Amino acid sequence: MTLSRSSADDSTNNANRSYSAVAGTDNKRKRDEDSSDYVGVAESLEMLKKQEIDADHMAASAQQTLISWRSGENSRSLSSSGECSSSNRPESTRLQIFVRMMSGGKTIVIHAEKYDTVEKLHQRIEWKTKIPALEQRVIYKGKQLQRENSLTYYSIEQDASLQLVARMQSTEHPVAWQTIDDIMYTISRMYKGENLQSNINEKIVTFFAMIPVESDESIAKYLNIFSNSSVPAALVMLYASSLERNKSCAKSSVKLFLSNCVALPKNQKNYCLPIVLEFCKLLRKVCPDQKLYVTCRNTLGSMLETFDNPHGVYNDQYETFGVEIFPFFTELTGLLLNELAQNSGPSFCDFQKVSSFWQQLRKVIELKVAFPIPIVLPMQSTALEAEIRHLHRLFGSLLTTMDLCMCRVESSLADKEVGNSETMSSSWSQYLSILKIINSMSNIYQGAKGQLAVMLNKNKVSFSALVVKFAKRGDDHQWIFEYKEATNFEARRHLAMLLFPDVKEDFEEMHEMLIDRSNLLSESFEYIVGASPEALHGGLFMEFKNEEATGPGVLREWFYLVCQEIFNPKNTLFLRSADDFRRFSPNPASKVDPLHPDFFEFTGRVIALALMHKVQVGVLFDRVFFLQLAGLKISLEDIKDTDRIMYNSCKQILEMDPEFFDSNAGLGLTFVLETEELGKRDTIELCPDGKLKAVNSKNRKQYVDLLIERRFATPILEQVKQFSRGFTDMLSHSVPPRSFFKRLYLEDLDGMLRGGENPISIDDWKAHTEYNGFKETDRQIDWFWKILKKMTEEEQRSILFFWTSNKFVPVEGFRGLSSKLYIYRLYEANDRLPLSHTCFYRLCIPRYPTITLMEQRLRLIAQDHVSSSFGKW
Amino acid sequence: MSEKKVFVFGSFTEHETRSFFEQKPTKDPQNSKDKCVGSIQFGSLNLAAENSSVNTNGELKKGEADGTVKSAGSQERLDASRPASSDKNNDSDAKLPRKNSLRVPEHVVQNGIIKEISESNKSLNNGVAVKTDPIGLDNLSMSDGESDPVYKASSSKFQALDNEDFSSDSSSGSIQRKKNLKVPTESVPPVKDFTPRGLINAGNLCFLNATLQALLSCSPFVQLLQKIQLQDIPKADSPTLAAFSEFISELDVPSSSSIRNNVTVVEAGRPFRPAMFEGVLRNFTPDVLNNMSGRPRQEDAQEFLSFIMDQMHDELLKLKEQSPKVTASKSSVISSANDDGDEWETVGPKNKSAVTRTQSFVPSELSEIFGGQLKSVVKAKGTKASATVQPYLLLHLDIHPDGVQGIEDALHLFSAQEDLEGYRASVTGKTGVVSASKSIKIQKLSKIMILHLMRFSYGSQGSTKLRKGVKFPLELNLNRSHLVSLSNESLRYELVATITHHGWDPSKGHYTTDARRKNGQWLRFDDASVTPIGTKLVLHDQAYVLFYKQV
């Protein structure tokens, strides 16, 4: 490590000196031109000298021949001839020079060629002395030699004495500085038109390999080397040059840098963001229409998605950061608007970039703008003033464009209903996310949320359809409930169901239950309450004892039966509403049984599981119960259907003429409530000293509010809490308890629990039924539907239950069921009773000979006691 | 007519002389008042003379010429009268009136038209010119102190007069030169004595500040800079010369602080940022973005010194190339040197004398100051000796051996004979390696000798700094054994500056400069801080670069 660091020290400054050599090139070239005249003279002198040398060597060779002849040794002759041939060279380029060491007082002899580079000289010195080449400085005639020049360039001749010197240099990352120096030097030479092999990409990889990991401060200092050296500007300048080779080299280098940035761990990637932003700004000026700029901008967008340390990276420059990324956000939003207008997009990737820029911009605005949010336009001087004005215009454009898009969606949906089989366009997939961004913008400006609400209400059909189609589990949809008025039942139901885990129907994951019909409630209780929430999240596998059947049909029957037991008033768990017998609320008297609180938790789980499995159990909740589950306050109008007598009494109290009311001494009322519970009468004070407090025209509103709360909410507080806990167990993790019910209205929950309010439509039923073994024109089929129409609604539901284990039809009718219904032909005796496979919605009947016999058989299975068993025949 | 003119001027002169002699013995305050009255009278008489000359000649041109001369004369009188009145009790009071009386004939003579009078004027002019210099210097110092525009104008006129005297007669010029040589003995400081000012370090710039402060203590270099300052240096072609020119101009601006030549107290000028060197630094380190503020790293001071000397040398040669005469002489120097080399090579085989190769600077003003010549002789067994002469700007001294305790030891080691390994007698032949030895001696000394003590080195642990103490004297007498041959050059050098690196390793540290002023006082320049120090502190043994000036 020490060696590597020291090596970089020398290389850094040697690279620096290379630039200074470039500055002095003109002077040296001129001197070379001046000396060219002398070269001619030297040549003539050299020729004269050569002749003399040749004559001298001829004599010498003759003497050596004589010597060798006398001694009789042939080897001497060979050696002699070799010398002659080498002596005949016109001029030798070999040099012998002396290098004085930096320490130790020693001089070494170096053999070199005249046209060797100084770099090669450094390597020879390194070979002899083990001093790294990058660590060396060589001085001759007062000059420090530059590596890329030749020895001849410095007029180094035979027996020249050179001085080797070391240096001091302070830098925290010497290898990094050396790497950056090499990059800059290469770029400089390429920009001047030199044809050399580029090693910039290798240097970039080397630079990235050495990024420190200890602390944010060290990372920032290290990466600042890249910025302080102006490498981004140099690379962009190289990219903008006219030479195609330079352009392609710069392009690959920039792309390599960007890909390395994206691959870094997060804390290092955060500090690369300013450099990528610098690249974006430079490329936007130089070549805004080219592909490299788009690549760079996209990289910046993807890095902004995970950028979570703005204070560490930008510190007090956070406002500047906002100003700098705003042009890119504007650019991308412009592209988005174009795609929306042409109905050609945007794709997920395109939208993701806009979103990431917006998230960072929003943070900057929230932190740096002096005015409280929402902002009232026109505004006085503040930070990011121009950007905020521009953003408001973008908000207007986006709102208008999305309005057009939503109208287009509605037209497509209308065409689809008529009969056009066109499916939803893939270009609609990002509309919901775009609306979310528009909502985020509307938080900044006063009155903007109102504009968005108007637009969404106008396009309610489109908005709801988009929600049902594209709202996914795991995303954040909380913003949609700010515009609840713009959604319909299907959209709200979809959003509520997203809170449940997905049922996989994997047998390995299912929770198995084996239930004895005679002990339905107690055994179901143990199976459900005894299980962990995780086990139940995988779904239920239901089987009745002594019966062969399994599958979703059995499960649906179980849900219906167990709810019938739970909500049976005889079990004292729930009470029917006084006016609407279909609605239930917890029974205040249920606290008598010590085990009953657990049963409310059990009930919460069962209701949640039924909703999760999309089974209509036919039970409705009272409005008061629903409001408590949603965490909302109960008002006078809410008890209208629960207790009409009390509703009318309270209404009279509030609407009575004040003078008349007071003259009658408040009808003799005080702040007390008389209750009867299990035969025991009691008087409860609504507030401290309630008995002594008379009701008058001024406090009668308070009296009514306290009365309602004490009468309806307080008695079942514990039961509601237990139910809510059980219900929440079935939701996905980290979901707030009341969020499910907050997403719905009471009518929505009614539709999910009981299905449609209307009587069963026989025509709808028939339209969703297919036949096997029968033709639609057969007389038995005609008889079947005629008989069904003559039955009562209760008998029809019994037939449906026998057929599918569903007693109630979903809100949207039979198309809401998981599959079509089927009538199969039994090839057995013609007088047999019908059979059914509820799992597959299959009813099997023989070919009855007469309509009378068919009617008799169908009415038989419509009786309740007959239809409640499997496989007993 | 002409006789009348002579009569009028002569009578005034005699009258003035008589009144002066009459007043001198008494030396009473009342007499000084009489002097003022006398001067007024003289003025009125001159006006009368002007009128008479106009009336007699009838030419406007002559009248105008007389008018300008008289106005200058009147201002001189005002200047003379004020110091006389202010220095009533001064001993020099007696001298000033004499000078005043002598000055009047000068102007009277200048008014003369007859040739006979002009001949006598020349001799008088020579005498007067010699004496006017002290007056000008005194006025200059006074004007510096009082900063009065009137005095500044008068001082500039004095300078103009001096210049006229220079250009008018070559003999008077020679007299002036001799007088300049005598100035040090008279202990009068020269005009260009800069106030010491600190240099602000805006971030890792102490190597620049230390180098500049050291160079300012080399008076031949400062003279070169002053010469450069007068020229119009193109900044694009010669960034280093332009930077130094601007640097000298910045130093030449008088600062608000006054100078007191006191050993214990020094009032330095306001420190400033050497921003004019930003271009030079950019050339020195092209990779560093912020060269002047927030510079990310330190540099080697000796490396920077070599760099700027190299750059200045090249830029000065470039300026010379604009003149054809210099080009001719340049080519002749190159050819003559090579001719000598060739002759020696051809004689070699026939004789036993050494073969000598010579490399030399193309001479520039910079190499004349800092440049010298080294001669190295290689003696190999079985072959003739080989000598090589090459120039140097700095001497790089090895201080690592234990035997080196001071500069003398380092110089001795520098010129000691050493054995060579791997030496080949004939590069072109295939003869084997023979034993050889090599020695280096100084053939020509430089006016400023820069000694670079090589403290930074590379060892088994990597890059290192040698913290060893090396003693160096205030006066250095070079040993003759370090020289090739005896010469008329002086072997005496005196220390003028040192650059010191403070720190324990080569990766960090700080640079300071100790520099000697002309009055012999030593100052320590630590970036913006300037403090006086004693010679004991100067002679600490941790110096990195030493600057010695030839005496």
Swiss-Prot record, chain A:
Class of enzymatic activity (EC top level): transferase
Span of domain Ubiquitin-like: 95-171
Domain HECT: 532-873
GO biological process: leaf senescence; protein ubiquitination; response to hydrogen peroxide; response to jasmonic acid
UniProt KW Transferase keyword: yes
Protein name, as recorded: E3 ubiquitin-protein ligase UPL5
GO cellular component, one term: cytoplasm
Main function: E3 ubiquitin protein ligase that regulates leaf senescence through ubiquitination and subsequent degradation of WRKY53.
Subunit structure: Interacts with WRKY53.
Keywords: Cytoplasm, Lectin, Transferase, Ubl conjugation pathway
Pfam family name, one: HECT
Biased composition (Polar residues): 1-19
GO molecular function, one term: carbohydrate binding
Pathway: Protein modification; protein ubiquitination
Traits of the deletion mutant: Accelerated senescence.
EC number: 2.3.2.26
Keyword Transferase: yes
Curated annotation (Swiss-Prot), chain B:
Enzyme category, top tier: hydrolase
One of the Pfam families matching this protein, by short name: UCH
Any one GO molecular-function label of the UniProt entry: cysteine-type deubiquitinase activity
Listed EC numbers: 3.4.19.12
Key words, A-Z: Hydrolase, Protease, Thiol protease, Ubl conjugation pathway
Catalytic residues as annotated in Swiss-Prot or TrEMBL: 206 (nucleophile), 510 (proton acceptor)
Functional description taken from the UniProt entry: Recognizes and hydrolyzes the peptide bond at the C-terminal Gly of ubiquitin. Involved in the processing of poly-ubiquitin precursors as well as that of ubiquitinated proteins.
Protein name, UniProt field: Ubiquitin carboxyl-terminal hydrolase 24
Organism of this sequence: Arabidopsis thaliana (Mouse-ear cress)
Taxonomy of the source species: Eukaryota, Viridiplantae, Streptophyta, Embryophyta, Tracheophyta
Name of the gene encoding the protein in the UniProt record: UBP24
